[in-house]
Amino acid sequence: MIYTRITINPNQMSGVPCIRGLRMPVATVIRMVAEGMPTEKILEEHPSLEKEDVQEALRFAAEAVRERELPRTGT
């Protein structure tokens, strides 16, 4: 899959995946979603983001963990 809204630039944020070249790491967006922040609130607090950015960040994160060995859980 090609992610048109995710950029990885070694000269920006140490190469951390970011949204559209902004200094907004994908991980930050994912954390906000995981903490229960509605997309509308994320967009309100970060007006440079668009709804599609949040959606693509979620897809990117899902793909990033899809075929990786995951840490063991307590179950």
Model regions and ranges:
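N-terminal first-folded block
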Residues: M1-M24
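Amphipathic, hydrophobic secondary-structure cores in small proteins
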Residues: V16-I19, R23-A57
